[in-house]
Amino acid sequence: MAEEPGVWSLLERAPIDWTEPWLIGLAAFHILCFIVTYISFKSYPLQICHFLLMVVLVSCAEYINEFAAMHWRAYSKQQYFDSSGMFISLAFSAPLLCNTIIIVVHWVYKTLCVMTELKTLQQKRKESREKRKKKE
């Protein structure tokens, strides 16, 4: 029985030249986005701006795909941008959407923490009122 090919061997066999400068730049852009996502956990305004920027970029992916399909010879050795938008969806939009999901999960976690803290304070306040009533 043949062994399943790994992700790396699939990437090597794909008809994509990963050494093209613009693909390396795209990978660097996504790494930078992940770093900013991590850093933005400490700054809520930065996180909101970063989130909105990524959402806008994903929503503009169709237009970027059309532009890239028309001008691919200027920066690439092959045409990656087809009418279905599969390449741009996987190489551009998917990593950005992963970042936005990470941010949304972080927001849900922070909201749950605040709700838990609020409920704890409400319980303490209720207990202190009951203690005061018993003393009176």
Swiss-Prot record:
Pfam families in the cross-refs: TMEM18
GO CC, any one term: nuclear membrane
UniProt keyword annotation of NAD present: no
Compartments (UniProt record): Nucleus membrane
UniProt keyword terms in alphabetical order: Coiled coil, DNA-binding, Membrane, Nucleus, Transmembrane, Transmembrane helix
A GO molecular function held by the record: DNA binding
Residue ranges annotated as Nuclear topological domain: 42-43, 106
Ranges in the topological domain labelled Perinuclear space: 1-20, 65-84
Database matches in InterPro entries: TMEM18
Coiled coil ranges: 112-136
Similarity comment: Belongs to the TMEM18 family.
Protein name: Transmembrane protein 18
Gene of this entry: tmem18
